[in-house]
């Protein structure tokens, strides 16, 4: 066997060398083919490349074996020379693959290959390994590129899908909007007649309401004219006034236009105002005719013009004030542009107080701002409630007056002449039965309290029992006079005073004391006292400069108010002992109370004069102003403003009246202000000058000026 192998190796040594070269060339070619194939087709996998290399190596080994066999047959002698260069078949089979270290040792031990052949094999092996690494890297790169391409494609597809979805949504929204618009257009096309009909119906309803209101206003105006006509005729029959024929015929001419009989007008008047049935003969009851909407007016024999009627706000739905304003617009041109709702250039509508330069501007303001609307109606309803409360209080005050007169054992029929002529200024209404006692007609006198006019009469004018119960609402002072705590009167009507613009019937000193006593530590600063006034009474939320001056004056005037300096600053406290001493002096009639009375009249004489003048025999009729017979159904809103009780509060220079009313009971105590007659008029007889419709602004100013005199007396 050894000889055969040796001969084969010797004879085929050259062929082996050629085979090795061909093998290496084939391997190089295979590697080049692999590279070219890898370059051309990036999709060929490494597994296919390995198979391809193995197949090439097997083919090269087979060719090598075939060459060795053929060369061994041709030259067996040259095998000995070429033996060191012979490569066994097993090594040729291993060349394409990686040679392990064990195989290398076996090859070296057997000394089959020379060092050159080993180097060639190692180089070939390294080349193959490099090719494999390059192929693997290339494959990895290809895979990454493919993966990136796939990701990009997926992202693009997702974006396209999202865009498609958005487009679909937009299309759907557009379709929905188009459908809605089409539906609206269809509805508008289907229902144009309904909207027009609704508008026409609304316009018709508004026109009907306006027509009804106009008819109602005309009827009310005609009723008022009829009532005024009837009242003037009754006064003319009594011989109290003389009415020219032309003036009396004006209301009569307007009656046939209404198309209503007097009975129908009277029934409509009852339904509107809610008053009781008309009394045909109001003289029998010794009071006023309750059906008159305006105050009864009388004129003197020398003047032919009647005084303007006094209207009130107690008509339902707030229509009386507007109608009265329209009714009076013609008569105001003749009577010097006077109106109940207009005084001193200011509109007297509740809560208005707009400044009007002249009467024409006032009429425009009244027709524009206070027309028949919801606001005016609500204000009139509030005024109606105030009047109802005042009527209830009036009945109580009448009972109280009768009880007082019974207690004092004063008979009105006892004639007691007055020791000295006095000018008694009082706001007293008169009844019709008193007008019957004397046919004398009286001159018209101004109604302002600042310039009283004393008409010449044949004897002293007196207050009769028939006129006393008809006294209107006045400012009351009984909380101080009768030692009744103020808190017991304010508490039940706290909400009323807080919301209604009504003057509280208390002195400033009493209010200041109440504010301090209600505080937690019984002390208040001046600003805190102001805050209490505005918080408790709605009346003090206006005219701040007027009443704040009065508060400061009272604080500095009265000894019962003590100024204390503390951490808060200057605070005011109440000396209760001094306050009670002041009250006791006022009740017992201390001589200091009569310091304003002239020395010629003592306290007793002044008291007797006031009571005797008030309760003397009614020998002569009570002199009156034509505009002072108020409507009893309105609660006698025109008030008495002066004090009759000289023994309790002899001179009340601070007692002004407010145009509002108070919800408290006992508000109608009678006050008569006694004033000495001026020197040149001492020979003139005593008279009563009635006053009404005081201006709140003038009275507030008057109160500030007279405060030093009044507060010491209280």
Curated annotation (Swiss-Prot):
UniProt-listed InterPro entries: FH_FOXP1_P2, Fork_head_dom, FOXP, FOXP-CC, TF_fork_head_CS_2, WH-like_DNA-bd_sf, WH_DNA-bd_sf
Gene Ontology terms: biological process: caudate nucleus development; putamen development; regulation of transcription by RNA polymerase II
Renumbered residue ranges of the record's region Disordered: 1-45, 284-338, 437-464, 648-667, 677-714
MF terms (GO), sorted A to Z: DNA binding; DNA-binding transcription repressor activity, RNA polymerase II-specific; protein homodimerization activity; RNA polymerase II cis-regulatory region sequence-specific DNA binding; zinc ion binding
DNA-binding feature ranges: 503-593
Location(s) in or outside the cell: Nucleus
Swiss-Prot/TrEMBL keywords: DNA-binding, Metal-binding, Nucleus, Repressor, Transcription, Transcription regulation, Zinc, Zinc-finger
CTBP1-binding: annotated segments: 421-425
Biased composition (Basic and acidic residues): 325-336
Pfam families documented for this protein: Forkhead, FOXP-CC
The keyword Transit peptide is assigned to this record: no
Cellular component annotations (GO), alphabetically ordered: nucleus
Biased composition (Low complexity): 291-304, 437-458
Main subcellular location: nucleus
CDD domains named in the record: FH_FOXP2
Ranges annotated as C2H2-type zinc finger: 345-370
Disulphide linkage map: none
Feature: compositional bias, Acidic residues: 698-714
The protein's assembly and partners: Forms homodimers and heterodimers with FOXP1 and FOXP4. Dimerization is required for DNA-binding. Interacts with CTBP1. Interacts with FOXP1. Interacts with TBR1. Interacts with ZMYM2.
Domain notes: The leucine-zipper is required for dimerization and transcriptional repression.
Record protein name field: Forkhead box protein P2
Taxonomic source organism: Macaca mulatta (Rhesus macaque)
Taxonomic lineage of the native organism: Eukaryota, Metazoa, Chordata, Craniata, Vertebrata
Gene name as annotated: FOXP2
């Amino acid at each position: 066997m050894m000889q055969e192998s040796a001969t084969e190796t010797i004879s085929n040594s050259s062929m082996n060398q050629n085979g090795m070269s061909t093998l290496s060339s084939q391997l190089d070619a295979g590697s080049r083919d692999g590279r070219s194939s890898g370059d051309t087709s990036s999709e060929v996998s490494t597994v296919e490349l390995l198979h391809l290399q193995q197949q090439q190596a097997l083919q090269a080994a087979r060719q090598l074996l075939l060459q060795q066999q053929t060369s061994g047959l041709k030259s067996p002698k040259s095998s000995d020379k070429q033996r060191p260069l012979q490569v066994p078949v097993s090594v040729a089979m291993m060349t394409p693959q990686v040679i392990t270290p064990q195989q290398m040792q076996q090859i070296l031990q057997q000394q089959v290959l020379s060092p050159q052949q080993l180097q060639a094999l190692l180089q070939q092996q390294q080349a193959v390994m490099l090719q494999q690494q390059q192929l693997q890297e290339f494959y990895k790169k290809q895979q990454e590129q493919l993966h990136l391409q796939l990701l990009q494609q997926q992202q693009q597809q997702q974006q396209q899908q999202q865009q498609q979805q958005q487009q679909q949504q937009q299309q759907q929204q557009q379709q929905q909007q188009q459908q809605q618009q089409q539906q609206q257009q269809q509805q508008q096309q289907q229902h144009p007649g309904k909207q027009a009909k609704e508008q026409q119906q609304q316009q018709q309803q508004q026109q009907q309401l306006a027509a009804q209101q106009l008819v109602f206003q005309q009827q009310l105006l005609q009723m008022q004219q009829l009532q005024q006509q009837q009242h003037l005729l009754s006064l003319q029959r009594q011989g109290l006034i003389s009415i020219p024929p032309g003036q009396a015929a004006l209301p009569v001419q307007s009656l046939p236009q209404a198309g209503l009989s007097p009975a129908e007008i009277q029934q409509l008047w009852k339904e509107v105002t809610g008053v009781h049935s008309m009394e045909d003969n109001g003289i029998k009851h010794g009071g006023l005719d309750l059906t008159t909407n305006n105050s009864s007016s009388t004129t003197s024999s020398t003047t032919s013009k009647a005084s303007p009627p006094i209207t009130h706000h107690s008509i339902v739905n707030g229509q009386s004030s507007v109608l009265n304003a329209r009714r009076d617009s013609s008569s105001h041109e003749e009577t010097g542009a006077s109106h109940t709702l207009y005084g001193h250039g200011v509109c007297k509508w509740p809560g208005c107080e707009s400044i009007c330069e002249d009467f024409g501007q006032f009429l425009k303001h009244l027709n524009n701002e206070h027309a028949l609307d919801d606001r005016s109606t609500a204000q009139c309803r509030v005024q109606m409630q105030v009047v109802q409360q005042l009527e209830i209080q009036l009945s109580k005050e009448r009972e109280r007056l009768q009880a007082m007169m019974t207690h004092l054992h004063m008979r009105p029929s006892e004639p007691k002449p007055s020791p000295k002529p006095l000018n008694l200024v009082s706001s007293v209404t008169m009844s019709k039965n008193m007008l019957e006692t004397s046919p004398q007609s009286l001159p018209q006198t101004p109604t302002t309290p600042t310039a009283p006019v004393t008409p010449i009469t044949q004897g002293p004018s007196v207050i009769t029992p028939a006129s006393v119960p008809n006294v209107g609402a006045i400012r009351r002072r009984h909380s101080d006079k009768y030692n009744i705590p103020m808190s017991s009167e304010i508490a039940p009507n706290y909400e009323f005073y807080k919301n209604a613009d009504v003057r509280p019937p208390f002195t400033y000193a009493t209010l200041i004391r109440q504010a301090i006593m209600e505080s937690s530590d019984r002390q208040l600063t001046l600003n805190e006292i102001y805050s209490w006034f505005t918080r408790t009474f709605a009346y003090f939320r206006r005219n701040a400069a007027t009443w704040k001056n009065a508060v400061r004056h009272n604080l500095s005037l009265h000894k019962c108010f003590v100024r204390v300096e503390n951490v808060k600053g200057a605070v005011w406290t109440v000396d209760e002992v001094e306050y009670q001493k002041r009250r006791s002096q006022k009740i017992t009639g201390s001589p200091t109370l009569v310091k304003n009375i002239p020395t010629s009249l003592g306290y007793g004489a002044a008291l007797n004069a006031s009571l005797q003048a008030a309760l003397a025999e009614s020998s002569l009729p009570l002199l009156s102003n034509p505009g002072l017979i108020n409507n009893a159904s309105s609660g006698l809103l025109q008030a008495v403003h002066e004090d009759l009780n000289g023994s309790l509060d002899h001179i009340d220079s601070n007692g002004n009246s407010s145009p509002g009313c108070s919800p408290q009971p006992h508000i109608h105590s009678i006050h008569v202000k006694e004033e000495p007659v001026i020197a040149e008029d001492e020979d003139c007889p005593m008279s009563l000058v009635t006053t009404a419709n005081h201006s709140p602004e003038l009275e507030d100013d008057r109160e500030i000026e007279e405060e030093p005199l009044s507060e010491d007396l209280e």
